[in-house]
Amino acid sequence: MKVSAALLCLLLIAAALTTQVLTQPDAIISPVTCCYTLTNKKISIQRLASYKRVTSSKCPKEAVIFKTVLNKEICADPKQKWVQDSMAHLDKKSQTQTAKP
């Protein structure tokens, strides 16, 4: 009993400390991805590959989901300056890549 209670506590703590990206059905065709925890740590621009905004009314928080070069998704607060700077950098990077012949 003590072992299962300790394991449950450990799992709850681990879940609270990790960045969670959960998918909930918005409609039959397209799912909505929501962020429930936002990172407080700045992510190096070199580690970022892309991003998408989370603005669905079905989600509790407005967020930006960055995808890293290692294909990891990280939720961030779009009001933070580093997040805005990173999105601008990725936008500029994608424009220069699509402009090349």
UniProtKB/Swiss-Prot annotation:
| Subcellular location field | Secreted
For this UniProt entry, which residues form the secretion signal?
Answer: 1-23
Q: Using the record's annotations, give every residue carrying the modification Pyrrolidone carboxylic acid.
A: 24
| GO biological process annotation, one example | positive regulation of synaptic transmission, glutamatergic
InterPro entries annotated for this entry?
Chemokine_b/g/d, Chemokine_CC_CS, Chemokine_IL8-like_dom, Interleukin_8-like_sf
Keywords for this entry? Answer: Chemotaxis, Cytokine, Disulfide bond, Inflammatory response, Pyrrolidone carboxylic acid, Secreted, Signal
Q: Which GO terms describe its molecular function?
A: CCR chemokine receptor binding; chemokine activity
For this chain, the annotated S-S bridges are 34-59, 35-75
Q: What induces it?
A: By TNF-alpha.
Q: Does the keyword Signal apply?
A: yes
Q: Which domain of life is it from?
A: Eukaryota
Tissues where the protein occurs: Endothelium of small veins and intrafascicular veins, and infiltrating leukocytes.
| Cellular compartments per GO CC | extracellular space
Coiled-coil spans are: none
Q: Does the keyword Secreted apply?
A: yes
The family database entries (PROSITE patterns) matched by this protein are listed as: SMALL_CYTOKINES_CC
Q: What modifications follow translation?
A: Processing at the N-terminus can regulate receptor and target cell selectivity. Deletion of the N-terminal residue converts it from an activator of basophil to an eosinophil chemoattractant.
Q: Its biological function? A: Acts as a ligand for C-C chemokine receptor CCR2. Signals through binding and activation of CCR2 and induces a strong chemotactic response and mobilization of intracellular calcium ions. Exhibits a chemotactic activity for monocytes and basophils but not neutrophils or eosinophils. Plays an important role in mediating peripheral nerve injury-induced neuropathic pain. Increases NMDA-mediated synaptic transmission in both dopamine D1 and D2 receptor-containing neurons, which may be caused by MAPK/ERK-dependent phosphorylation of GRIN2B/NMDAR2B.
Family membership: Belongs to the intercrine beta (chemokine CC) family.
What does the record note on quaternary structure?
Monomer or homodimer; in equilibrium. Is tethered on endothelial cells by glycosaminoglycan (GAG) side chains of proteoglycans. Interacts with TNFAIP6 (via Link domain).
Q: List the protein's name.
A: C-C motif chemokine 2
The organism is Canis lupus familiaris (Dog)
Whichever gene encodes this chain, its name is: CCL2
